[in-house]
UniProtKB/Swiss-Prot annotation:
UniProt note: domains: The cysteine framework is XIV (C-C-C-C).
Protein name: Alpha-conotoxin Pu14.1
Any one Gene Ontology BP term: venom-mediated perturbation of signal transduction in another organism
Summary of the function given for this chain in its UniProt record: Alpha-conotoxins act on postsynaptic membranes, they bind to the nicotinic acetylcholine receptors (nAChR) and thus inhibit them. At 1 uM, the synthetic peptide reversibly blocks mammalian nAChR alpha-1-beta-1-gamma-delta/CHRNA1-CHRNB1-CHRNG-CHRND and, to a lesser degree, alpha-6/alpha-3-beta-2 (CHRNA6/CHRNA3-CHRNB2). At 10 uM, it reversibly blocks nAChR alpha-3-beta-2/CHRNA3-CHRNB2. In vivo, intramuscular injection of 10-20 ug of the synthetic peptide in goldfish causes death, while intravenous injection of the same doses in mice causes unconsciousness.
């Protein structure tokens, strides 16, 4: 193969790798966002169920009162 042909193949490989990497990053962001929402819902349920009668040191009152925004 000539030098130009090798350079063209190199550019195609770099382009293909970039496109695949970009698409997989976008897909994983969506999955991570969904996982974060599920995790926060789970934490809210656990805190709601196991809310102590007296606040735990470092825990804000709004967590048990469901007024946190």
């Amino acid at each position: 193969m000539g030098m130009r042909m090798m350079f063209a193949v190199f550019l195609l490989v770099v382009l293909a790798t970039t496109v695949v990497s970009f698409n997989s990053d976008r897909a994983s962001d969506g999955r991570n966002a969904a996982a974060n929402v599920k995790a926060s819902d789970l934490m809210a349920r656990v805190l709601e169920k196991d809310c102590p009668p007296h606040p735990v040191p470092g825990m804000h009152k709004c967590v048990c009162l469901k007024t946190c925004r």
